[in-house]
Amino acid sequence: MERNMAGKLFSLRNVALLALSLSAASAYAVDVTVAYQTSAEPAKVAQAENSFAKRSGATVDWRKFDSGSSVLRALASGDVQIGNIGSSPLAVAASQKLPIEVFLIASQLGSSEALVVKNDIKSPQDLIGKRIAVPFISTTHYSLLASLKHWGIKPEQVKILNLQPPAIAAAWQRGDIDGAYVWAPVVNELAKQGKVLTDSAQVGEWGSPTLDVWVVRKDFAEKHPDVVTAFAASALQAQKAYLAAPEQWLKDPSHLSTLARLSGVPEAQVPELVKGNRYLPVADQVAQLGQPVDKAIRDTAEFLKQQGKIPQVDSDYSAYVTDRFVKQVQAAPQS
């Protein structure tokens, strides 16, 4: 009888402890909405495998956006806590004092973003008077303006139209535009019927490099630093496998199908797009998330001010960049 009673008390105690642990887990659970775009990068494997949620214990809602400007609006409203944007919208956000900070570099952009034009445009000078579409306040907008400056063409000599990528694809098919500076998957569709006049790798060599970055709302980062660190860790871990053996990684059918699905491009085009950008391991992330990214924001802001896109340029943008989360990843045993 005493053994039965002791057994019952033991069982009740276990049930109580289990209930308390479940209650604590529920209280700790964090809801986070992540804004992603359609770039084809190795870290998207982490998204597909849900490794961020597994590492953090958070409930994650991944939402696809067509451009950085739309991501900024979602970040500003609080609908999104973590978002993927380019260095141009980042400069705009910092100039507008949006309370966000860069915590991870997704990629240094190269041939994955390009200016594609109709085949009758033979040289940059043929752009004068033509209709060129681009999503305003995007990395490609910045790269287009930088290209025109390099070629000695004033922006007002070209009819620059503000269109989102899906609208660019439709306008191209209708014959409403003569070209567009855009990214995957639309850039791939345009290139089937047109030709690449320049790309962001070339523009970077001309002195106007661009980045894709991950940013987080500062209030969310302060409340949930472990969640942000888990995001950085999951992305860098997925990327690490690619950097260790790029060609072998790109031969894995599961990688190709994952990136094709999340980026909207055919599997056959994935390798070229992935190789078109540069991805930074954790040590390089730590080195870049400081003065280099601060300078990139400032240089971009200065250019955008010259073009009349923002009213002023600050002398210091370090408040919008942090390396503390990638340093946590670097310090962890698994890194």
Feature locations, PLM:
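Bacterial N-terminal signal peptides that target proteins for export
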Residues: 2-16
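Short, solvent-exposed loop/beta-turn-alpha elements that line the ligand-binding surface or hinge
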Residues: 54-57, 202-206, 282-291
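Conserved C-terminal helix/tail region of periplasmic/extracytoplasmic solute-binding proteins
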Residues: 294-335
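Short, glycine-/small- and polar/acidic-enriched structural segments
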Residues: 30-162, 178-184, 195, 200, ...
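Sec/Tat signal peptide C-region and signal peptidase I cleavage site
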Residues: 23-29
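Secondary-structure end/capping motifs
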Residues: 222-309
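Cleavable N-terminal signal peptides
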Residues: 16-17, 27
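Pocket-lining segment of extracytoplasmic ligand-binding domains
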Residues: 88, 161, 167-262
